[in-house]
Amino acid sequence: MSVQPTPADHFTFGLWTVGWTGADPFGVATRKNLDPVEAVHKLAELGAYGITFHDNDLIPFDATEAEREKILGDFNQALKDTGLKVPMVTTNLFSHPVFKDGGFTSNDRSIRRFALAKVLHNIDLAAEMGAETFVMWGGREGSEYDGSKDLAAALDRMREGVDTAAGYIKDKGYNLRIALEPKPNEPRGDIFLPTVGHGLAFIEQLEHGDIVGLNPETGHEQMAGLNFTHGIAQALWAEKLFHIDLNGQRGIKYDQDLVFGHGDLTSAFFTVDLLENGFPNGGPKYTGPRHFDYKPSRTDGYDGVWDSAKANMSMYLLLKERALAFRADPEVQEAMKTSGVFELGETTLNAGESAADLMNDSASFAGFDAEAAAERNFAFIRLNQLAIEHLLGSR
């Protein structure tokens, strides 16, 4: 398999990723600002499918209407010239000091109203750009001090904000879905909707939850000590995996935003295995963009930035090649059968069987030989060894 990406691979990048200047809480920028038009042309040259952005990645917070129109005109022309798409747009409700206590959940009602209006205006822009997904990351929605929030009221306000945005999308007839992005902490000490599980539970409380799903990120789930592949699997199973952010993370620490696969490589392999091959017994498959949300090393100049963009795509394609070979290997298929992976796809109850029927089945309870069943060798290590051998290219 070629590791030369093409638009058919549907790789996308946030403007804030390749455009990150290297500024962090401990140091100033190490690179100059990147012209969004240059970003479009360079990503297209590298074989990407699309580019995404927060409103203020592209248009400064305090831009005049004339400045806004000029920026959008230049950006749209670059998109037209290159064929690059904008599959997703999101809103910055975290950088400006007005959002220091959040947007949708700020204790200041006037700020909440401003934040919601900002989102609604940005939904219009997303629709104009042809985006299909509108991501909401509540980076400042949370607290450091438990007594500072009425937590029930905060969740009410979050629901109000998301439902208002979703209702607006429906009223306008836009071909957009909302994807909530969970994260446990950073920049807030504790962020509302910190994990995939929290996000799924929240969506169930929405009036317009039918067009609201999730945008899980590799590092965000791993920051909470969770298994990213399990998280996206549950979102996919619930048919709520609307978008995905791929990057690298090494353990429970700050959000590293490494190149995809440059953190937990085994986890990255099984993530790609799920995205490309789907569930072993069938089920929903992810068909959206493979979106990279990472930070190029601040130690590098722009040559290094573009090398890092290429590295994300190359890592994915290499892992895709390994994952396809893994599933196609007859020895792996036999090992999966031995381990009971396919048996798990069989319903526990027989067709038409009730709980009462099961209780009356003596072979399943009184006559069940638990000691003999306990002797079964599931051979999970052998199956995993085959996966690692494929990952390392030794098979």
From Swiss-Prot:
<dbReference type="GO" id="GO:0009045">
    <property type="term" value="F:xylose isomerase activity"/>
</dbReference>
<comment type="subunit">
    <text>Homotetramer.</text>
</comment>
<dbReference type="GO" id="GO:0042732">
    <property type="term" value="P:D-xylose metabolic process"/>
</dbReference>
<keyword id="KW-0859">Xylose metabolism</keyword>
<feature type="binding site">
    <location>
        <position position="217"/>
    </location>
    <ligand>
        <name>Mg(2+) 1</name>
    </ligand>
</feature>
<feature type="binding site">
    <location>
        <position position="217"/>
    </location>
    <ligand>
        <name>Mg(2+) 2</name>
    </ligand>
</feature>
<protein>
    <recommendedName>
        <fullName>Xylose isomerase</fullName>
        <ecNumber>5.3.1.5</ecNumber>
    </recommendedName>
</protein>
<feature type="binding site">
    <location>
        <position position="181"/>
    </location>
    <ligand>
        <name>Mg(2+) 1</name>
    </ligand>
</feature>
<dbReference type="InterPro" id="IPR036237">
    <property type="entry name" value="Xyl_isomerase-like_sf"/>
</dbReference>
<dbReference type="InterPro" id="IPR013453">
    <property type="entry name" value="XylA_actinobac"/>
</dbReference>
<feature type="binding site">
    <location>
        <position position="245"/>
    </location>
    <ligand>
        <name>Mg(2+) 1</name>
    </ligand>
</feature>
<keyword id="KW-0479">Metal-binding</keyword>
<feature type="binding site">
    <location>
        <position position="220"/>
    </location>
    <ligand>
        <name>Mg(2+) 2</name>
    </ligand>
</feature>
<dbReference type="Pfam" id="PF01261">
    <property type="entry name" value="AP_endonuc_2"/>
</dbReference>
<dbReference type="GO" id="GO:0000287">
    <property type="term" value="F:magnesium ion binding"/>
</dbReference>
<keyword id="KW-0963">Cytoplasm</keyword>
<feature type="binding site">
    <location>
        <position position="293"/>
    </location>
    <ligand>
        <name>Mg(2+) 1</name>
    </ligand>
</feature>
<feature type="active site">
    <location>
        <position position="54"/>
    </location>
</feature>
<dbReference type="InterPro" id="IPR013022">
    <property type="entry name" value="Xyl_isomerase-like_TIM-brl"/>
</dbReference>
<keyword id="KW-0413">Isomerase</keyword>
<keyword id="KW-0460">Magnesium</keyword>
<keyword id="KW-0119">Carbohydrate metabolism</keyword>
<dbReference type="InterPro" id="IPR001998">
    <property type="entry name" value="Xylose_isomerase"/>
</dbReference>
<feature type="active site">
    <location>
        <position position="57"/>
    </location>
</feature>
<feature type="binding site">
    <location>
        <position position="255"/>
    </location>
    <ligand>
        <name>Mg(2+) 2</name>
    </ligand>
</feature>
<feature type="binding site">
    <location>
        <position position="257"/>
    </location>
    <ligand>
        <name>Mg(2+) 2</name>
    </ligand>
</feature>
<dbReference type="GO" id="GO:0005737">
    <property type="term" value="C:cytoplasm"/>
</dbReference>
<comment type="similarity">
    <text>Belongs to the xylose isomerase family.</text>
</comment>
